[in-house]
Amino acid sequence: MSNEFNAQSFLRTVSSSAGVYRMYDVKNDVIYVGKAKDLKKRLTSYFRKNLANVKTQALVSHIHHINVTLTHSETDALLLENDYIKQYMPKYNVLLRDDKSYPYILLSQHEHPRLAYHRGPQREKGHYFGPYPNGGAVRESLHLMQKLFPIRQCDDLYYKSRSRPCLQYQLSRCSAPCVGKVSNADYDEQVKLASLFLKGKDQQVISALVDKMELAAERQAYEQAARFRDQIMALRKVAEQQEVSNNKGDMDVIGVHYSSGIACFHLLFIREGKIFGSRSYYPSVPAQTDMDEVLRSFILQFYLNADIQRTIPKEVVISHNFEELHELEAAVSEALDKKFSIKTNVRADRASFLRLAVTNATNAVVTRLSHKNTVEQRFVLLEEILELSTPIQRMECFDISHTMGESTVASCVVFNREGPHKGEYRRYNIEGITPGDDYAAMKQAVSRRFDKIEAGGKIPDILFIDGGLGQLRIAQKIVDEKFVHLDKAPQLIGVAKGEGRKPGLETLILGDTETSFSLEGDSPALHLIQHIRDESHRFAIAGHRNRRQKTRNTSTLESIPGIGPKRRKALLQHLGGLQEVKGASVAELVKVPGISIEMAQTIHDALRG
């Protein structure tokens, strides 16, 4: 503990009220946020002799000063604690990083409504169904909806531009309302059925379709009756495949497993009695954190994250009981201004769902631990091969990607002792070099990475360069220049491809001595190097392809006076692509919404000139 902090003197100033405390280190960074019903009693517990918890010992040793905020109640303290944790992200708190907005299915408010994937602010008028646990679940649902209900999924611009049915009509996945192939009444009926289906009311949809089929048969409209029959059969098949509960309400079921410092919260989103989707969360847990704190922190941060658009049910079922469960119920209920209950002792369908969630959480932790142990073993072997005196904590790898010098992109990927650390990945768009000059590209990328490096910054222990001696020398020169005034510099290693680019034949080159060596093809240390090299390669190629596609799609059209992003999008969507725009006549260009005869002539002349 810092000599500047006098615990006894501080504790004499603390009241026994409810409140929140923030612990700071010598750099004035918040390292821990906590709450208490009795601040004096809680804070005194940190400064007892013979603290048993290793995490608490480490925390106390870094305290420089403590700030206290009093609250009216313990519920207020819980809410304020959550706000402070989000604001400061303290290193000794359990942190849930859940910053992505959740996707929805949108049923738009339109003469002929469309079904669409939606993520972000809900500005467009219509009904939003969700949230879904991830984008894949939404796309899978939309794909299924196309087979069940012939409702359009195209955007409004494409819809307006149609003069004949598109391929989806030929595949019986859309009824082509854009060109009048279906009456408004029939289309509206399908929209209502789709809406009921998305609300989980399958049997109501099937009953309605059975009535329509029988009515069509009575009128001897056998072709229409057959279509309803096929739709009913498809719906029944889907309903059989979905696990359904007798409980028709909404709830979240949370299975928890915590082992060897890894916590997994596996959530089943139950909506209208069906498993709407599932998702695993892995909060960052400081060493030696007890289970109660992990549970409390997750519930608080997950259900009070106002930045995420999430539909919160009235009921949550969780696999573990914990000390402050009822206080959390009250805090979340007050914050949301709605009834909110947390249950642990459940039966029947709820118990079945809970067993499933716990099984998934347990399997996820076992898999992560296995992966973590494998990566750890590879790090240890690499340290032995390189004869390092200190453990490797951070590795980075650079790669360059381009097509004949076009749209050059450099990647920098980061690995720690748990594997890829994707939040630290970076891409660099390379500008101002001779196309195809990989040396200049590497020089620019490494220079930009270490331009503002300083002591205490994120310095890799090892920096891999995906390339031969020439690129390695360029990178080593830059590193020598940037780190001349610092005590620590990364060890550079070039990874030169072997004969025929076959894995296992790589040559490794040390940047400082230019000594080259190889490892056995089955060496776990080589597998680690190949992993970071391949990840860097993948990340560079993805960035290059995105940049190249954007350049090819935009530069030709947007260089034409009067063509901005909206008109470019209209041209590409209406005509099908850049090549089709280039081959279009003036008469065809005029048919695109927003393109006048003069503009069409300008586009035609510019692309043919």
Curated annotation (Swiss-Prot):
Residues 16-94 form the GIY-YIG domain. Residues 203-238 form the UVR domain. GO terms for cellular component: cytoplasm; excinuclease repair complex. Its main location: cytoplasm. GO terms for molecular function: DNA binding; excinuclease ABC activity. GO terms for biological process: nucleotide-excision repair; SOS response. The keyword DNA damage applies. InterPro entries: GIY-YIG_endonuc, GIY-YIG_endonuc_sf, GIY-YIG_UvrC_Cho, Hlx-hairpin-Hlx_DNA-bd_motif, RuvA_2-like, UVR_dom, UVR_dom_sf, UvrABC_protein_C. Keywords: Cytoplasm, DNA damage, DNA excision, DNA repair, Excision nuclease, SOS response. Disulfide bonds: none annotated. The keyword Ribosomal protein does not apply. It is found in: Cytoplasm. Coiled coil: none annotated. Interacts with UvrB in an incision complex. Belongs to the UvrC family. The UvrABC repair system catalyzes the recognition and processing of DNA lesions. UvrC both incises the 5' and 3' sides of the lesion. The N-terminal half is responsible for the 3' incision and the C-terminal half is responsible for the 5' incision. This is UvrABC system protein C. It comes from Shewanella baltica (strain OS155 / ATCC BAA-1091).
